[in-house]
Amino acid sequence: MRACDSNLRADVPDTPDPRRRRAIAWLGALPVALALPARAELLGYPSHPLRLVVPAAEGSVFDAVARALATQLQQQIGRLADVDDRPAANGMAAGDLVARAPADSHTLLLQQTTFVVQPALEPAPYDPLRDFQPVAMVATLPLFLAVDARLPITTVTELIAQAHGESVSVNCGSDIIGTWSHLVAEQFVRDYAFHAPHVAVRGEAGLVQQVLAGRMAACFACYPSLSTGVSSGQLRLLGVTGSARSSFAPTTPTLRETGLAGFDYSAWVGAFMPARTPKPLLIRAATEFRRALASSDVIATLRAGGFEPEWSASDALAQAVRRDANHWQGLIRQVDLRVDTGE
């Protein structure tokens, strides 16, 4: 034995003190003990049917997306997965139900970007940042800027120039104030300093019809609402929101590519659970959603609604929630948007 080895062991007794042995044994068992609750939660998950709550009416696009996801999840986990449509109170009834549900990961909320915006428009019974745990992002929703093809406008720059001269009307239309297309249009006219009052229309179909009829020059809408007009040559696509081109129209540049620096907004669709849901259960659910996005039926249903399938984990969705809440609530305060509650 070398001298240094001898010196290292000189003060260590051959037989450890019993108390020291017990302390070492307890410390060794601590990681296992801490892991047991999480493992126990996962062993029986899901222990009863899943409930996917949706802030939309039965038969709507969002309801169809939820049902496609629920069907696939049911096949994966071997448990019933129900869709619960709660469109009341502009969809806030859905959030209220999930916020009050047990934090056992069996009740989930399917929502999109406007979920974190709504409390700035009208009183909400929950806080989207504090009362929910993001699970996973499952899709994004790009919007296209489309113009009446009869107009001599082929670029976004030309549209903005004519809007400044008030020779064309760029809408801020929607059937409900605070919809995604409405918010993006408000951001557009604010960034490029021209006047565009809000026009009440019936959904995106009504919005597009205004452009086709020549009552508006342009609008923001998802691709399925525009596809017929584009294929018939009545509408011209100038650009798309988001950080990358859309697979719906890959030759259409992003608005950022056209020179609108920073205009890369894209809505997300994500799943949420009540606050205080244990992290292992969030991760397990996120994994199942990721598997579900490999389903051709889920992909087809998402794309039929204008959504691009895109999975991101809980942390990435949480970051998007905080970013969008800060940005869009700030815009709402700046332009003083309010939902008419009839009071």
Residue ranges and their predicted role:
Residues 140, 226-294, 340:
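C-terminal lobe and pocket-closing loops
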Residues 113-123, 187-191, 218-252:
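A ligand-binding cleft/hinge motif common to bilobed small-molecule-binding domains
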Residues 47-49, 190-192, 279-343:
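An extracytoplasmic/periplasmic, membrane-proximal ligand-sensing/linker region
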Residues 1-34:
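N-terminal secretory signal peptides
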Residues 100-106, 120-206, 255, 268-301:
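Hinge/capping helix and adjacent helix->loop/strand transition within the periplasmic-binding protein
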Residues 41-130, 194-217, 229, 311, ...:
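N-terminal (or domain-start) structured segment
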Residues 36-39:
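Sec/Tat signal peptide C-region and signal peptidase I cleavage site
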